[in-house]
Amino acid sequence: MGVFVVLLSIATLFGSTSGTALGPRGNHSDCNSVDHGYQCFPELSHKWGLYAPYFSLQDESPFPLDVPDDCQITFVQALARHGARSPTDSKTKAYAATIAAIQKNATTFPGKYAFLKSYNYSMGSEDLTPFGRNQLQDMGAQFYRRYDTLTRHINPFIRAADSSRVHESAEKFVEGFQNARQGDPRANPHQPSPRVDVVIPEGTAYNNTLEHSICTAFEDSTVGDAAADNFTAVFAPAIAKRLEADLPGVQLSADDVINLMAMCPFETVSLTDDAHTLSPFCDLFTAAEWTQYNYLLSLDKYYGYGGGNPLGPVQGVGWANELIARLTHSPVHDHTCVNNTLDANPATFPLNATLYADFSHDSNLVSIFWALGLYNGTKALSQTTVEDTTQTDGYAAAWTVPFAARAYIEMMQCRAEKQPLVRVLVNDRVMPLHGCAVDNLGRCKRDDFVEGLSFARAGGNWAECF
């Protein structure tokens, strides 16, 4: 496969953690913070699936988040989704068309619908919103603070997929990280700012563990779309009927209903730089309907990129094998989507670093989490009935891949242990690991953790891609 890499800097990294008490960015609203993420309108915003802004799941964690006093973090791999963005180009056109049709055909716009009469669709497509940029600055600050005994003296090695919103997210993470360091009187004042070290091209011509493109059978799959269509047919017609009764002259398809619901999160994350203003589209739907919408988006990701798609998890195998290499300081062994040109070069894939941060897309994160076995306890999701997180073993799109989602794979050395221990945090939720013996703090011994990644080490079912 061909390769094009933007190599901005190479850092030498070594290190160990506690937590610097640095203040949040000054323009935060009371419900949006570095430590807890987006807690504005939680009864709504936490039901926006993959369009929900990141919010901390610490209170939902089955294990404590704190690191024991007798342990020291020695390694961290961060994996993050880009921040809040405008809709994709195709969705922007679809949303605008739905609104235009309503404006053309409705004979009256009563009450909560009044804003629609003169509404002007003005969102762009694909790019980060100002709020999305701030999310990644916050993540950089959070990462610095959480691992400050390391970050005061060490820079993370940073990679990003070559999508503008992903690359910019990585750059904003760097800004937040460095701003936090500059505000820390205990930091090394001579340590240069981190930079985005490697940008990996996207597309079918390139192997890239941070963006899926090359598994032909997977790219042609319609499993996710079919599952989403099945559930949409269950709940959307009743909503369409209600809206049509409220807006005489209007006829709405199931897709129109989903388009109008999507306008709620997308406009909310676009209106202000801290998303403190709720879009008027949000008030057009009931709490029960938002629960259904949230489940629809979870279903779509599960059957599109997760365990519900036979070729979903294998899309994350390459990254899982890179993680194994970094944890064990050994060369990458993979025959799936790893870019061997990059990973064989210590300048573009160092094995001796302490801190790593990779930036990608929501779909890739879903596949990676399944390749790591984090949701092995999640059974096939119903396509006709809403299931909550107690029924899905903690899986939901809003809990897993919201805007600015972040996973931290930590390795720690503890006084009573000869071997380092590994745990995984997804949006501040310490994950119940599968495939290895877990202690009462959610940790496995490193060698057991690696051994448990048997699906990834065997290359999954990659042969079925072609």
Curated annotation (Swiss-Prot):
Catalytic activity line of the entry: 1D-myo-inositol hexakisphosphate + H2O = 1D-myo-inositol 1,2,4,5,6-pentakisphosphate + phosphate; 1D-myo-inositol 1,2,4,5,6-pentakisphosphate + H2O = 1D-myo-inositol 1,2,5,6-tetrakisphosphate + phosphate; 1D-myo-inositol 1,2,5,6-tetrakisphosphate + H2O = 1D-myo-inositol 1,2,6-trisphosphate + phosphate; 1D-myo-inositol 1,2,6-trisphosphate + H2O = 1D-myo-inositol 1,2-bisphosphate + phosphate
Listed GO MF terms: 3-phytase activity; acid phosphatase activity
Residues modified by glycosylation: 27, 105, 120, 207, 230, 339, 352, 376
Protein name: Phytase A
Family matches, as SUPFAM superfamilies: Phosphoglycerate mutase-like
Cystine pairings recorded for this chain: 31-40, 71-414, 215-465, 264-282, 436-444
Superkingdom in the source lineage: Eukaryota
EC nos: 3.1.3.-, 3.1.3.8
Assembly mode: Monomer.
Keywords, alphabetical: Disulfide bond, Glycoprotein, Hydrolase, Secreted, Signal
PROSITE patterns: HIS_ACID_PHOSPHAT_1, HIS_ACID_PHOSPHAT_2
Pfam families the record matches: His_Phos_2
GO cellular component: extracellular region
UniProt similarity note: Belongs to the histidine acid phosphatase family.
Residues annotated as signal peptide: 1-19
Cellular location(s): Secreted
InterPro entries on file: Acid_Pase_AS (IPR033379), His_Pase_clade-2 (IPR000560), His_PPase_superfam (IPR029033), Histidine_acid_Pase_euk (IPR016274)
Active site: 82 (nucleophile)
Enzyme class of the recorded protein, top EC level: hydrolase
Upper classification of the organism: Eukaryota, Fungi, Dikarya, Ascomycota, Pezizomycotina
Function: Catalyzes the phosphate monoester hydrolysis of phytic acid (myo-inositol hexakisphosphate), which results in the stepwise formation of myo-inositol pentakis-, tetrakis-, tris-, bis-, and monophosphates, as well as the liberation of inorganic phosphate. Myo-inositol 2-monophosphate is the end product. Has a broad substrate specificity and is also able to dephosphorylate other classic acid phosphatase substrates such as p-nitrophenyl phosphate, phenyl phosphate, fructose 1,6-bisphosphate, glucose 6-phosphate, 3-phosphoglycerate, as well as ADP and ATP.
Binding site for 1D-myo-inositol hexakisphosphate: 51, 81-82, 85, 88, 165, 301, 361-362
Species of the source: Aspergillus terreus (strain NIH 2624 / FGSC A1156)
